[in-house]
UniProtKB/Swiss-Prot annotation:
Keyword Transferase: no
Pfam families noted in UniProt: Herpes_UL37_1 (PF03970)
Alphabetically ordered keywords of this record: Host cytoplasm, Host Golgi apparatus, Host nucleus, Virion, Virion tegument
Subunit structure: Interacts (via C-terminus) with the large tegument protein/LTP (via N-terminus).
Protein name: Inner tegument protein
Protein's UniProt keywords contain Zinc: no
Reported function: Plays an essential role in cytoplasmic secondary envelopment during viral egress. Interacts with the capsid via the large tegument protein/LTP and participates in its transport to the host trans-Golgi network (TGN) where secondary envelopment occurs. Modulates tegumentation and capsid accumulation at the viral assembly complex.
A cellular component annotation (GO) from this entry: viral tegument
Subcellular location: Virion tegument; Host cytoplasm; Host nucleus; Host Golgi apparatus, Host trans-Golgi network
């Protein structure tokens, strides 16, 4: 596809070529009329903001520079001199270079080629032949030298970054990117700092190597011998997951294996618990890597027994983890947050204390490297912050009911601190790979911080952050820091170059003309080149960098109120009547009269204003408006002063409208609307002042102050912005609704599967740690399988956890939906305000229709919010209260059993019995209260086998050893195949046997503590006595 050409540049070349062809009889210098035409053409180019593709740059350079030099040799205009001497810099300022992260070297080759083109021998010869300087700051020699030096430095930075990326363990270092950017933006490159190719180059380099900063911090922690082996191993896993997943590094695998060998066995759970699958994918990934001693193992192979890393709170007390890095074992930290939210235990208080210290360091950070180092060194990596943010959002937003929450009841100080770390960390990792002194980063920073504050606007108050508190913390570290001094220095250099050109023109006029010749000497401070260049650059400073340019009173003098000299009024009226679009400017002596300025403004600017406000705000209408606005701006710009800044206002309006004529126009925002409206009203005010200074009988009719009631342009402008805003809100809302719908369907499916799963029949097996599941329909003798009880509870807990995770996502989505509703309500108020203003005009229905659309939209969002709230409000999942009760009971029993196994004692065994007794009692009560219709409905559903497979997922079935055909279970303690001929009556002598399991549980304290249990040797002695074995007479009554 052929590259588009720059219209303004090509138009300048064509116009100058036509002037060159029209030269007759070697007329030198050119006539004043022809000179003025050339001045206007060059000035129009100097004001241009259009971009120049690289291919067009090469094609146009030689003929354009040649024609400008030719114009100067025939006119000696300051505009031509400035442009000829500084054309390389002016073109590089407008260069449209497509930088890519994949191949930045291609852009450097193009830059090298362009910098060589502008400094070829023919260019230097043309300048010297016309007595123009080759040493100007933006001229061929200077620009070639600076850009070549910058390219060389960029290549070094790119090579260092590439080497560091390819070999990060040996070549990457903290601060290397900052040093490279500082070198590329040092003072000697100040004059090219604002040029787009420099800005884009820095942006690409930052995105290319910005991730090396957190990587280096993690690598330093891995080599930190003061950290425990488990902590270092977890850092290795995290570093690989975030940065090295594609290419395994052998040396890191060896380092990981050596580190894992140093981890104490007590860091892992017992073998009995290890058979239970981990609850999360991340926990499975960590445990698998540690079990296989390979950081590139992401899951345990089926049938393989793997060690499982501990998550309990005790891991924080056993010197297994370094407390200075609480975020690196994120699963244990989340478990601690869930089990000890108040940080009341020893583990919780220790971790909370270190966490508060980390938060204080984060708040005291003043640069990106300080903030990222603090977070990464503490284990709060990108992934850790993401999980923490999700956890805190779930536990906090669960308390919100229709936008209100009692924060103290739902989040503790410990959770608040970690929530703040998660939010700040997420923002920091998002910004670190784009942080640079570029205009792009200014937009990225503003958009990212604003979007985050809107997304979590209901969460931030609960975290203790005041309005704007998150942005304040980020500003200290990541606020845009453009090099304002470089931009201001560039403006000074431009002024110096303009002064050189003006001095040369003034000298020429003084040498070749005298007062009687009628020559029009340029007035100091009012030259067209000064006005055009500074207007262009000052608008650029303001719009791109937010820098307010210095006020130059000489460039914007007030409109002259003095009456014209005797006899000139009629001449001025006659000349003013000739001014009409699209006539060319014809130089006349009356144009230099200060009292003629009101006539110029009252004709050209009034025509442009009247035409613009009558057009429609669409591509064709904007193009037509730009044509007449540019004509009004350029008419008489060589001699007519910029009174009241009218040309500056026209230039600003042109600059903001021009992008909307492109193939891919920018999004029309409220800021655009207010700026355009303000500029049009300012022009109307200036025109009104000028018209009031004209004689009464020649005053043109000035339209009323432009507004949506009398201006088609403004009415369609406001309507298009409101419609575009509604389109964006609707699109975002639809994406949220689709997400809500898909999540609700997933939750519904999971709940149906659980309903079918618990409707199945569960039967005991010889192994008391396993249970069988079969079809609930009695007529179908269909067994689905046998699983360990631990696996069953873990599978159900995983499903419930997945549903809770989906609800958390939906809660975050609700925050976004509330933001959309607030924006829609604001737009609705604007629509109603505009509808009121236009109620009696023809365009009234436009805004009433838009107001109705916003009203329906807002109501729809409210309906969606109320429906989604039903699923997300509260801690418990609607419809799954019984499942969560089951999981809580199971967790209490399992915890008691684990404690009794680890620390056997009478008290721990009694606790197990009490938990079992309470569980059985609760089950009996549940059976009495359970609705029979519900269970009957669930049992009559189909595909129970699919539900069991879905819930149990890939968990291995338990193989029950059925033993011999007689049913006896043979073990190392029992080798009896049949009990028919065995006399076991002696086992009942002097022994009290409880008849039922319920009695055992109810009498457990008495049986365990109050009764004496038979010892094995006493039982054996009794057996020997019965058998008549001599020598064994010991024994006693129980």
């Amino acid at each position: 596809m052929e590259e588009p050409i720059c219209y303004d540049t090509q138009k300048l070349l064509d116009d100058l070529s036509n002037l060159k062809v029209q030269e007759a009889d070697n007329e030198r210098p050119w006539s004043p009329e022809k000179t003025e035409i050339a001045r206007v053409k060059v000035v129009k180019f100097l004001r241009s903001t259009q971009k120049i593709p690289a291919k067009h740059f090469i094609q146009i350079w030689e003929p354009l520079h040649s024609n400008i030099c030719f114009v100067y040799s025939n006119t000696f205009l300051a505009e031509a001199a400035f442009t000829a001497e500084n054309l390389p810099g002016l073109l590089f300022w407008r260069l449209d270079l497509d930088w890519t992260i994949e191949e930045p070297g291609n852009s450097l080759k193009i830059l090298t080629q362009l910098s060589s083109v502008v400094q070829d021998s023919e260019t230097l010869h043309r300048l010297s032949a016309n007595k123009l300087r080759t040493s100007s700051k933006f001229g061929p020699v200077s620009i070639h030298f600076i850009i070549t030096d910058w390219i060389n430095m960029y290549e070094v930075a790119l090579k260092d970054a590439t080497t560091a990326i390819e070999s990060p363990f040996t070549h990457a270092r903290i601060g290397m990117l900052e040093s490279a950017i500082a070198a590329l933006t040092q003072h000697k490159f100040a004059i090219i700092y604002d040029m787009p190719f420099v800005q884009e180059g820095i942006r690409v380099l930052t995105q290319y190597a910005g991730w090396l900063l957190p990587f280096n911090v993690m690598w330093n922690q891995i080599q930190n011998s003061s950290l425990t082996p488990l902590t270092r191993a977890l850092f290795i896993i995290c570093m690989i997951d975030e940065y090295l997943t594609e290419t395994p590094v052998h040396s890191i695998s060896e380092l990981f294996a050596d580190t894992v060998n140093l981890i104490k066995d007590e860091a892992f759970v017992s073998i009995e618990e290890a058979v239970t699958n981990p609850r999360t994918v991340h926990e499975s990934r960590i445990s698998s890597a540690l079990a296989y001693r390979d950081p590139y193992v992401f899951e345990t192979s089926p049938g393989m027994l793997a060690r499982r890393l501990r998550l309990d709170n005790g891991i924080w007390e056993s010197n297994l983890l370094s407390l200075s890095t609480p975020g690196i074992h994120i699963e244990a930290l989340l478990h601690l947050l869930n089990s000890d939210p108040e940080a009341e235990t020893t583990s919780g208080s220790n971790v909370a204390e270190h966490t508060r210290g980390i938060w204080e360091k984060v708040q005291a950070s003043t640069s990106p490297s300080m903030l990222i180092s603090t977070l990464a060194e503490s284990g709060f990596t990108r992934f850790s912050c993401k999980l923490l943010r999700r956890f805190i959002a779930h536990h906090t937003l669960a308390g919100f009911i229709h936008g209100s929450v009692v924060a103290d009841e739902h989040i503790t100080d410990f959770q608040q601190t970690l929530g703040c770390l998660a939010l700040v960390g997420g923002l920091a990792y998002q910004l670190v790979e784009t942080y640079a002194p570029t205009t792009e980063y200014v937009l990225t920073y503003t958009r990212t911080v604003n979007e985050t504050e809107k997304r979590y606007e209901t969460l931030l108050p609960a975290l203790g952050l005041p309005p704007g508190g998150l942005g304040q913390i980020m500003r200290r570290c990541f606020a845009p820091r453009p090099l304002i001094e470089s931009i201001q220095a560039t403006r000074v250099i431009l002024l110096n170059e303009i002064s050189h050109a003006e001095a040369r023109e003034t000298t020429y006029f003084k040498q070749t003309h005298n007062q009687s010749s009628g020559a029009l000497l340029p007035q100091a401070g009012q030259s067209a080149v000064r006005e055009a260049v500074l207007t262009w650059f000052d608008l650029r400073m303001d719009s791109r960098w937010g820098i307010t340019p210095p006020v130059d009173v000489g460039m914007t003098p007030p409109i002259c109120v003095d009456p014209p000299a005797t006899g000139l009024e009629a001449v001025m009226i006659t000349e003013a009547l000739k001014i009409a679009y699209p006539t060319e400017y014809n130089r006349s002596s009356v144009f230099v009269e200060p009292s003629f300025v009101p006539y110029i403004i009252a004709t050209s600017t009034l025509d442009a204003l009247s035409a613009t406000i009558a057009l429609s705000f669409d591509t064709r209408g904007i193009q037509q408006a730009l044509s007449i606005l540019q004509w009004a701006r350029d008419y008489g710009s060589g001699t007519v002063p910029n009174a009241d800044g009218y040309r500056t206002k026209l230039s600003a309006l042109i600059t903001i409208l021009e992008p909307f004529t492109r193939t891919h126009p920018p999004v029309l925002l409220p800021s655009h609307v207010s700026t355009i409206d303000s500029l049009i009203c300012e022009l109307h005010r200036t025109v009104g002042i000028a018209v009031d200074l004209l004689p009464q009988h020649v005053r043109p009719l000035v339209p009323d102050r432009p507004s949506i009631t009398n201006s088609v342009f403004l009415a369609t402008l406001y309507y298009d912005e409101l419609y575009g805003r509604w389109t964006r809100l609707d699109k975002t809302s639809q994406a949220l609704v689709e997400n809500f719908t898909s999540n609700a369907l997933v939750v519904s499916r999971y709940m149906l599967m659980l309903q079918k799963f618990f409707a199945c029949r569960f039967y005991p097996t010889p192994d008391l740690q396993a249970v069988g599941i079969c079809n609930p329909k009695v007529e179908r003798d269909e067994q689905f399988g046998v699983w360990r009880l631990n696996d069953l509870a873990d599978a159900v807990g995983h499903i419930v956890g997945t549903i809770q995770g989906i609800r958390t996502q939906m809660r975050v989505g609700i925050s976004s939906l509330r933001t959309i509703m607030a924006d829609a309500s604001s737009a609705l108020r604007e629509c109603e305000n505009l509808m009121t203003k236009t109620s009696t005009s023809a365009i009234g229905p436009l805004f009433s229709t838009m107001a109705s659309r916003y009203a329906r939209f807002t109501q729809d969002q409210m309906d969606i919010l109320m429906r989604v709230d039903k699923l997300t409000t509260g801690e418990n999942i609607p419809g799954l209260a019984n499942v969560e009760i089951f999981l809580n009971r199971w967790e209490r029993i399992a915890t008691a059993c684990r404690h009794a196994t680890a620390v056997p004692s009478a008290e721990s065994i009694a606790t197990v019995c009490n938990e079992l007794r309470r569980g059985l009692k609760n089950i009996q009560e549940d059976r009495v209260n359970a609705p029979t219709s519900y269970m009957s409905h669930a049992r009559n559903l189909e595909d129970h086998k699919a539900a069991v497979s879905f819930v149990m997922d890939s968990r291995q079935q338990f193989i029950v050893d059925s033993g011999p055909q007689m049913g006896a279970v043979l073990t190392s303690q029992c080798n009896i195949g049949t009990w028919e001929n065995v006399n076991a009556t002696f086992l009942h002598d002097n022994v009290k046997i409880t008849t039922t399991v319920r009695d055992v549980i109810s009498e457990a304290p008495t049986l365990i503590i109050g009764q004496r249990w038979l010892r094995p040797d006493e039982i054996l002695s009794n057996v020997d006595l019965r058998l008549g074995v001599p020598g064994n007479t010991s024994g006693s009554d129980p």
